[in-house]
Amino acid sequence: MAGKKNINGFPFISFEREYYDSEVMKIRCKYFYTFMNERRTCRNFSDKPVPKEIIENIILTASSAPSGAHKQPWTFCVVSSPEIKKQIRIEAEKEENESYNGRMPDEWKKDLLPLQTDWKKEFLETAPYLIIVFKKSYDYDTAGNKTNTYYATESCGIACGFLLAAIHHAGLTALTHTPSPMNFLSTILNRPANEKAFLVIPVGYVAEECWVPDIKRKTLNEVSQWF
């Protein structure tokens, strides 16, 4: 049972972690790396239903992420309504069409060639769920008073990492989608002025036939410096 104490007028509880010897830790972290390294961005989803409880637990995991001053500056909007998904697809494809046919510089489009992406986003309707993460630039307390958030962008980024790991752990697949601009999402989902769309994540089972680019991740030496 956790111990409790008061520090400068604020409640604290004791914190302990299960201890593993170094050999067990090596096995655990190697297993987790191997498992996470199997994760791939997917654009081909099955429309097979996913139990709501699975999505709820995935979101709870994401919301366990650390955040600036523990303000938890996020809202996870879950869309399963076919009508709303269709609306989102129509508006997203308008923006993506403009991006692919005018906004994007040639170098960007060249970098996307190995991924073979285009402005058509059928996965926004096929995936059983869209999880749309909104970032709160400020918030309100229970009395309705405006309150600050801190490092909201970084906090939401960390939460999205937790979210993607939880999706993969559940046996589902996902895609990180960022139509730009994303203001239409606030309108469709009737979000308050303090929330701004941060990321669109279609979630579901992988389609029976799914192809992903044969690309490689950078090596440890390429992504780390040791001092």
Protein language model regions, located:
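Small-aliphatic-rich amphipathic alpha-helix that forms the alpha element of a beta-alpha
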Residues: 58-63, 137-188
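C-terminal helix-cap and adjacent tail motif
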Residues: 2-24, 28, 196-227
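Short, electropositive alpha-helical surface patch
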Residues: 185-198
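Glycine-rich, charged/polar anion/phosphate-binding loops
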Residues: 61-63, 114-119, 185-187, 210
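N-terminal accessory segments that position/regulate proteins before the catalytic core
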Residues: 1-42, 46-57, 87-90, 98, ...
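Glycine-rich phosphate/pyrophosphate-binding beta-alpha loops
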Residues: 63-69
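Short loop-to-beta-strand entry elements in the cores of soluble alpha/beta enzymes
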Residues: 69-80
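Glycine/small-residue-rich phosphate/adenosyl-binding loop
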Residues: 5, 78-156
